[in-house]
């Protein structure tokens, strides 16, 4: 009798649960949003006179745009490094989560994926808090400026990463209460 109970337990732990699948979708969305945020040309805009991304800063002088690299400023390099580091960890977590679907014993991958996602969230939050603080401190614009969709995509990626981490932390033994 004990052997049949342990056999049932083994079958139950190898079934893919919907929350883990939703968690994997959250990780994929976070990865897509991170790619969009890093490649976005619009992190800060100012009345069609100024654009700032993670890679370049462009100012409009009369009818001509003058662009400079932002990789000369230490805070912009730090922001880029934090976001790329977080995106790399999210990519690894996604690959581990995807591989865990293909492997029979999935439960051993849940905790590492959750830990990686929480680490990525910490890195990205640090970068996303650093960016506006240092921008306001160092860049003086005489016109109205706003943080644009690239910055918003990065926050979206961070939120989806956090959601995926929470879903991967949920204990699969308690799922029968929900179904």
UniProtKB/Swiss-Prot annotation:
The chain crosses the membrane at residues 21-41, 81-101, 113-133, 150-170. Keywords: Cell junction, Membrane, Transmembrane, Transmembrane helix. One of its GO terms (cellular component) is adherens junction. It is a multi-pass membrane protein. It is found in: Membrane; Cell junction, Adherens junction. Signal peptide: none annotated. Gene3D superfamilies: 1.20.140.150. The keyword Metal-binding does not apply. The keyword Membrane applies. Belongs to the TMEM47 family. Regulates cell junction organization in epithelial cells. May play a role in the transition from adherens junction to tight junction assembly. This is Transmembrane protein 47. It comes from Xenopus tropicalis. The gene is tmem47.
